Amino acid sequence: QKTGIDMTAALSVSASDSKDSQPAPDGKVGVSKLRTFADTIRDAKTNDLASLKTYLDNNGGGIDTMVKAIEYDYDIVPQIYQSDTSKATVQVSPDQSMKQMEAGFGSGAFGSMVLTNAFYQMPATSSLYTSAYDVVAGSWPSGANQVVLVLDEDGNIPNLFEYTLGLKDHKEFDDLMRSYYQGTLGGKSQSGAQSGTQSGASTATYDYSAILGTTFRRVNAFDKYTWDDTYKVWTDRSSDADYMKKLVDGGQQLTISGIVKPNSDKGGALRQGIAYTPALTYRIIEEAAASPIVKAQRAKPDVDVFTGKT
């Protein structure tokens, strides 16, 4: 990626990272504590991706003889929601529950933090990971409509994922983030506020059957905009609850087809989270390229389609 902040540790907890972490019972998915955020924020870096790709494509340094595969990751974050919209539309990719913190501390750090969530693309080369993981339930995903839940070596997931998966009410996590934000800015020490976020750590376990088959809905970012014929601009409808409910209900369904965990403590090419196939990324790219809003912007590159101004 061009720029980023290393937030992997915030979402990935191994047995060696926490003395409180215990292996999950056989046939169960356990939950480990969410790490404190302050310990995982790193300086953002900028990379020259164009030059790097040219170098790799031309076998720079004889790299073809030293690697099994070269993987490219696109700066695309799927817009994914929980399927149940009966109470509200709950976006889980990118997760919106950190808005209070972003508002208080600025979008620079936490904007990147929000983009690093449970969902991520798995490598296109399956040989990079299949032998390093055991399928404990279901099967590896195939196609753009399936995803896989990746556990740690002890069979656990961070407690954050309980909210993502709908095992706990996502509103609880919203309140947790709000408490963190208010505690930090209200005079409490940062460590004290963080201990509050960890107090919600769960010791629950879940049957594989409670997670396998869980569905989500993906929508296209451009579908959140509709054309305003009066002002001749594209209008953001993401704050329109009725519009968003209809959009999410009709979105692409993603289903957890399997649950996997590393077959050794060395792990593999995957991290804890919900991994989707490259086919989903390609579908998002294709649908975006064919969308009216993108076509309109390309037709008039000097005009901002959101404001109508040059």
Language model features with spans:
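Basic-flanked hydrophobic alpha-helices used for secretion and membrane insertion
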Residues: 1-310
